[in-house]
């Protein structure tokens, strides 16, 4: 009987951790971690110029996007940003 009570308490604690823990809420804002993994992958290959650079601040699967030269296309940097 005591094992059953311990098991029930353990299950409730684990469920509470899963459902109430802020780290598992799926939330997190970009202010928490500026290099958080985002999926701005739609900008990969986008046309970029000096005047119009859609790559700035975009991250695709942990890789920061940038415009290698003026009048080119957005590509991913090879350095991985953990997030």
Curated annotation (Swiss-Prot):
It comes from the Eukaryota. The modification Proline amide is found at residue 82. It is found in: Secreted; Nematocyst. Contains 3 disulfide bonds. One of its GO terms (cellular component) is extracellular region. Keywords: Amidation, Cleavage on pair of basic residues, Disulfide bond, Nematocyst, Secreted, Signal, Toxin. Residues 21-36 form a propeptide. The keyword Disulfide bond applies. Residues 1-20 form the signal peptide. GO terms for molecular function: toxin activity. The keyword Manganese does not apply. Expressed by acrorhagi. Toxin. This is U-actitoxin-Aeq6b. It comes from Actinia equina (Beadlet anemone). The lineage of its organism: Eukaryota, Metazoa, Cnidaria, Anthozoa, Hexacorallia.
């Amino acid at each position: 009987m005591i094992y059953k009570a311990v098991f029930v308490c353990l299950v409730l604690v684990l469920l509470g951790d899963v459902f109430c823990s802020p780290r598992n809420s799926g939330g997190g804002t970009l202010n928490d971690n500026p290099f958080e993994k985002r999926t701005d992958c739609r900008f990969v290959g986008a046309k970029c110029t000096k005047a119009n650079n859609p790559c700035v601040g975009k991250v695709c699967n942990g890789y920061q996007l940038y415009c290698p030269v003026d009048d080119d296309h957005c590509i991913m940097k090879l350095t991985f940003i953990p997030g």
